[in-house]
């Protein structure tokens, strides 16, 4: 993935959040597979961001400078054990993703849920050959709430089963300052402003938000 940045002694500490990966020696084939996966998913994410920009009647490259040459992106290989092992139905609590976009490849075991209204959850049923795509908080902020970050959670699978997924997260460079873009009047009228959550402050200076 992305190599560590070359930093001076007086560089802000948050810049050190982006560093080298630690690869398991027991799985030598993992590194080239994930590096290729990252490369392909980065291109998918950029294409989708540019499509969003056009749909918002912005220049196609409106978001390009925010992720730049050093986007903050990462991959998770996730296993959710069955409830008998965890003694809890919670796989991951309700949250929003912090970046621009996230892509989730699921196995056939359901468990991902999306909040469509306060306290109302629906299953994101796995579909073979597809990704679940979540809008993140940075897009919500950049569009003044016209695009809404997806509140989602994961419920642990039943006993004696497991759930596997691969998540890819595309974010901005750590030093990016995210503007609120000017939308055309017909879209701006529907922008509700970004949600305010005192437990999860949304800051325009990306580095200070980590």
Predicted regions and their residues:
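Peripheral, non-catalytic segments flanking oxidoreductase cores
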Residues: 1-210
């Amino acid at each position: 993935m992305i190599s560590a940045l070359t930093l001076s002694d007086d560089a802000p500490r948050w810049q050190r959040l982006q560093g080298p990966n630690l690869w398991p020696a027991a799985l030598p084939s993992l590194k080239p597979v994930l590096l290729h996966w990252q490369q392909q998913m980065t291109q998918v994410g950029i294409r989708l961001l540019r499509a969003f920009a056009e749909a918002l009647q912005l220049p196609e490259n409106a978001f390009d400078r925010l992720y730049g040459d050093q986007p903050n992106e990462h991959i998770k290989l996730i296993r959710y054990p069955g409830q008998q092992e965890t003694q809890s139905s919670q796989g991951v609590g309700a949250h929003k993703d912090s970046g621009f976009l996230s892509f989730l490849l699921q196995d056939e075991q359901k468990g991902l849920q999306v909040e469509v209204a306060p306290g109302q959850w629906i299953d994101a049923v796995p579909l073979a050959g597809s990704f679940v795509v979540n809008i993140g908080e940075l897009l919500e902020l950049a569009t003044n709430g016209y695009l809404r970050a997806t509140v989602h959670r994961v419920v642990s699978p039943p006993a004696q089963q497991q759930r596997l997924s691969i998540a890819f997260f595309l974010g901005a460079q750590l030093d990016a300052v995210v503007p609120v873009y000017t939308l055309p009047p017909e879209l701006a009228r529907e922008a509700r402003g970004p949600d305010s959550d005192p437990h999860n402050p949304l800051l325009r200076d990306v580095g200070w938000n980590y």
